[in-house]
């Protein structure tokens, strides 16, 4: 939505580019007067299907109606909870409206949303990964401390704890709904956010930023001309096996042996989307031109 950090990043990537005048921006959100709404030519309020007075079908009907009325050519997703709904209804929306919906397949969304499925995807494809356990398969007495405990479903570091011992771990497990226990990788100074663009069955472009976090979001990013080859090769392998559609964000750390290990997949644009455009990597414009100019 136009009020989300991701939505605003998408809008700013267009508005602050040399192609700004080429596009009319139609925004959607669940609240009036969001920051991003003032950067759009129009902004519509959608029914909130998390509330009792609205349903998912009503939401889809309203969205589809506005896409047709405004002759929208391409739809970007700026809110996490919309991803799976749009992924499951992408074919019908595109058939009914001729609007391209930039969202990955449901399988990709599920792998990204579920941290244990992320781990299984990496493990099953022989890619480096943090050791990851469900509580019922974890040997608490033989863990290497510290470890990370976090929700199986979640994003932006919500409910994520670094724990130093068994007592603390058991306490945190009881605080978290559907938790997983994960190996602690490297340190906070070796964390990267990596963006990829995957279209037409191939990896089109990528970027890696070293990042520092505040409240689960990136507040400081560093871009280096020479990116670690191991990270580059690792990203390439993940992208070609995962096969997302459009933009996908990969969070990883490099361990003490220099091995990159991914711990989170966000099959969507990132909060750093606009920051990346300042480094010459404007993924939104790239996708717009690749899809609309065919």
What feature does the model see in each segment?
Residues 108-188, 198-202, 229:
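Active-site nucleotide/adenylate-binding loops and adjacent lid/helix of ATP-dependent enzymes
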Residues 147, 204, 261-264:
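Protein kinase-like catalytic core scaffold
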């Amino acid at each position: 939505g136009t009020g989300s950090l991701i939505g605003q990043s998408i809008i700013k990537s267009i508005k602050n580019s040399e192609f700004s005048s080429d596009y009319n921006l139609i925004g959607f959100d669940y609240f009036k007067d969001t920051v991003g709404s003032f950067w759009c030519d129009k902004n519509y309020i959608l029914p909130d299907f998390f509330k009792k007075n609205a349903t998912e079908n009503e939401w889809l009907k309203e969205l589809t109606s506005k896409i047709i009325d405004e002759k929208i050519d391409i739809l970007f997703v700026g809110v996490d909870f919309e991803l799976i709904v749009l992924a499951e209804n992408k074919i019908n929306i595109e058939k009914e409206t001729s609007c391209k919906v930039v969202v990955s397949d449901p399988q990709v969304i599920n792998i990204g949303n579920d941290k244990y499925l992320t781990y299984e995807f990496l493990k099953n494809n022989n890619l480096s990964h943090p050791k990851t356990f469900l509580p019922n398969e974890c040997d608490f007495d033989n863990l290497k401390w510290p470890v990370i405990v976090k929700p199986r479903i979640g994003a932006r570091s919500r409910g994520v704890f670094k724990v130093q011992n068994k007592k603390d771990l058991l306490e945190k497990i009881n605080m978290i709904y559907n938790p997983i226990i994960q190996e602690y990788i490297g340190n906070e100074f070796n964390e990267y956010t990596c963006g990829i663009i995957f279209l037409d069955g191939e990896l089109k472009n990528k970027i890696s930023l070293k990042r520092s976090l505040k409240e689960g979001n990136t507040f400081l990013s560093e871009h280096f001309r020479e990116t670690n080859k191991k990270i580059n090769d690792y990203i390439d392998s993940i992208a070609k096996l995962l096969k997302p559609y459009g933009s996908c964000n990969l969070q990883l750390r490099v361990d003490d042996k220099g091995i990159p290990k991914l711990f989170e997949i966000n099959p969507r644009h990132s909060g750093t989307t606009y920051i990346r455009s300042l480094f010459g990597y404007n993924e939104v414009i790239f996708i717009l031109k690749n899809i609309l100019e065919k």
